[in-house]
Design a protein with these regions (language model features):
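Generic long, charged, amphipathic alpha-helical segments
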Residues: 64-81
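Short, Lys/Arg- and Gly-enriched loop/turn segments at beta-strand edges
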Residues: 114-121, 141-142
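Single conserved hydrophobic/aromatic residue that forms the stacking wall/gate
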Residues: 160-169
Length: 169
C-alpha cells in the first residue's frame, strides 16, 4: 500500500517528519497465536515484563513483516506489543509473511515456572508445550520436552468428562 511505501521511505530519512514517527507501530500486522496471554505470560500484561520472543523457523529468510501478537481468548484482549530490540523496546516483532500451507511458530523464552503458577487455568487453554534447553561450548542439548495438556485433560480438570455420555435437553 502507499502508506507502507511512505513508511519505508520515512524510515530511511535522517530527519523524518514527526508525523511519520509512529507509522510503523500503526502498520504492524496482528498475528493471532494459539495461547492465552493471561495464562502463559501473566507478567507480560500485569507488570509489562518484556520476554525474548522470536520466530523459530525460516531463520534463513529475512523477516518481511512487522507484527504484534494477539491471543485467541474469548475477547482477544491478550496482546504483546513490546519486544526486546537491539537498542530499546520495539513496538512490533519482525516476522515472515504467512504461508497458507504451513504453520508459523514463534517462541517465547525465559518464561519459567513462575509464570505457570501465576497463570493457573485461564479460558480452558491448559498448559502449553514446553522445551528445556541447555547451552554449552559445543552447542545445545534438549534436556526435556513437556507436552501440553489435551482438550480432554483440560475438560477433565473442569469436571467435564468426555468419556461419559452427554445429556441433551
Amino acid at each position: 500500500s502507499i502508506t507502507r511505501e511512505i513508511n519505508q521511505i520515512a524510515e530511511g530519512l535522517k530527519h523524518a517528519p514527526d508525523e511519520f514517527r509512529g507509522l510503523s507501530k500503526l502498520l504492524a500486522d496482528k498475528y493471532f497465536c494459539n495461547f492465552s496471554l493471561f495464562q502463559s505470560l501473566p507478567d507480560s500484561w500485569a507488570i509489562d515484563q518484556i520476554f525474548p520472543i522470536m520466530p523459530i523457523q525460516r531463520l534463513d529468510e529475512k523477516p518481511d513483516r512487522s507484527a504484534t501478537l494477539q491471543d485467541i481468548t474469548c475477547d482477544s484482549d491478550g496482546k504483546i506489543a513490546n519486544f526486546i530490540s537491539t537498542r530499546n523496546v520495539a513496538h512490533y516483532l519482525p516476522v515472515h509473511s504467512l504461508k497458507k500451507t504451513e504453520p508459523y511458530y514463534v517462541a517465547v523464552f525465559l518464561v519459567g515456572a513462575y509464570q505457570e503458577i501465576l497463570g493457573d487455568m485461564h479460558n480452558l487453554f491448559g498448559d502449553t508445550n514446553a522445551v528445556h534447553v541447555s547451552v554449552n561450548e559445543k552447542g545445545y542439548n534438549i534436556e526435556q520436552i513437556i507436552d501440553g495438556e489435551t482438550v480432554a485433560e483440560v475438560l477433565d480438570l473442569s469436571l467435564i468428562h468426555i468419556s461419559e455420555p452427554t445429556r441433551r435437553s
